[in-house]
Design a protein with these regions (language model features):
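Divalent metal-coordination and catalytic microenvironments
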Residues: 17, 47, 85, 114, ...
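Mid-to-C-terminal alpha-helical segments outside catalytic/metal-binding sites
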Residues: 69-70, 74-81, 90-135
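Residue-level detector of flexible, active-site-proximal loop/helix-junction positions
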Residues: 20-22, 87, 124
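Short Gly/Pro-enriched loop/turn and capping motifs at secondary-structure junctions
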Residues: 52-54, 86-89
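Catalytic pocket-lining loop regions of alpha/beta-barrel enzymes
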Residues: 1-81, 134-135
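Tryptophan-centric aromatic hotspots in well-structured domains and transmembrane helices
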Residues: 31-35, 59, 63, 86, ...
Length: 135
């Protein structure tokens, strides 16, 4: 994917599910890191911090927080957006628990970016006009 994006650097891409790191073995996570680093080279890539369930590994909250934190570090907090993937994520965690996990990851690596990751980046990436609050 990263090589394809090199040919179209103006293309904006929003990567779902934190790059989907299903294989949680050391080799699998290293492959995920390499892919994420390659995608990080393209400024048009934004990562949705969502859904870390894996058919290959049991739900592990601490491991998921670490993956979220690493994704934020690799891509940069200005190119990450919060997402939930509910109702699917609800198979493993409540919405409140998922939000708390993402907030813990943000606090580990970019506490100053909480507002950006949870709100501002999505407004920018999706070009939302929300100058007026919903009534």
């Amino acid at each position: 994917a990263a090589r394809t994006l090199e040919a179209t650097p103006e293309l904006r891409v929003i990567l779902n599910h934190t790059g989907l790191p299903w294989d949680r073995s050391s080799a699998g996570l290293e492959q995920w890191r390499q892919g994420m680093r390659a995608l990080a080279e393209n400024p048009g890539v934004t990562v949705k911090l969502s859904e870390l369930g894996s058919p290959m590994a049991a739900w592990d909250e601490a491991a998921n927080v670490a993956i979220l934190a690493e994704a934020i570090e690799i891509i940069g907090p200005d190119r990450c957006v919060f997402a939930s993937n509910f109702p699917v994520t609800g198979l493993n965690a409540s919405y409140a628990d998922w939000l708390a996990m993402v907030e813990r990851a943000i606090a580990l690596v970019a506490p100053e970016a909480r507002q950006a990751i949870l709100h501002d980046n999505a407004v920018r990436c999706y070009r939302l006009d929300i100058s007026e609050p919903a009534s």
